[in-house]
Amino acid sequence: MRNVTLVLSDGTKFHGKSFGYDAPVAGEVVFNTAMMGYPESLTDPSDAGQLLTMTFPLVGNYGVPPFTIEESGIPTFMESDKIYVSALIVSDYTEEHSHWNAVESLADWLKREHVPGITGIDTRELTKVLREHGVMMGKILFDDEPNNIPEADYEGVNFVDRVSTKEIIHYNEGAGKKVVLVDCGVKANIIRSLITRGVEVIRVPWNYDYTGMDYDGLFLGNGPGDPDMCNDAVEVIRKQMSMSKKPICGICMGNQLLSKAAGAKIYKLKYGHRGHNQPVRMVGTDKCYITSQNHGYAVDASTLDKDWQELFVNMNDGSNEGIRHKENPWFTSQFHPEACSGPVDTYFMFDKFVETLK
């Protein structure tokens, strides 16, 4: 393993060893508190452009499952068809993996997909730095090479445009109700969660004008980066809401886009919510759910139009976790009810949406 250094934009340095693809890289340094699920996290398009730090110390111990495609056309064990993170940062990479479904090691997978990995980092200290000072840009540099990699511009890039489908894709054709899925970087398990409930899914590009299509409901998927880069999608959502009261549901980026269409403002969280243990409360009830989350931006609920209200609130920091319209069947969650990986406490969100289609 070659010696590498993680250099944060404030000058803080962490020294470690390379266990992935040997190449320098720059991106936004973030942390994820999940104890498992690295195959899903690495292939989640929402992590595009990020240097992902896993706070759980042992990573790689169960290897990597095979990349297979289900009959429905979506990956079986991954959330997309490739790794989207720019690099993986861990405390202790486990070289000898063991799992009945593993076909290769995490290191071999990273190398095959040309994704750098760094181990031996004090991820506890790194997380404390990010928690105190906020997420920041960083570089992974090789100690025996000159620093000739440019700074990354995370907030100035439309990552949604990079990861979204470029063509219309149909799933479960011929099923009962039709749902248009706006792909901002949608995870495979969101598609799976819809088609297993007996609907046809029509996956469209993030900025596609679907208002003239024949469908029964609209679903706004997750995605990476700054939602303010996606105003084209917001305008189409507004157009749809002005034309009909067809059901609308959104997840993660979908929550932010629908909120923008409802007049709300978006702001960047200090260090985001990334992990499997985020508690949220359903507004107006005493019900609290443990959720899987992966976002760095949040909705300023105080700026919502008067016809809208909060649906969920984060119990840790009070930030918005979902909205709903007071009359029409339009609602969202900032968290991921489909999990994969993580808790499935809020899987009922898909049931609620499909029920509104009938």
Locations of regions flagged by a protein language model:
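Residue-level detector of beta-strand face positions
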Residues: 5, 279-281, 322
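Active-site-proximal beta-strand elements of phosphoester/diester hydrolases
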Residues: 178-183, 291-292, 331-335
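A glycine-centered loop/beta-turn motif at secondary-structure junctions
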Residues: 322-358
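Catalytic beta-strand/loop cores that center a nucleophilic Ser/Cys/Thr
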Residues: 287-327
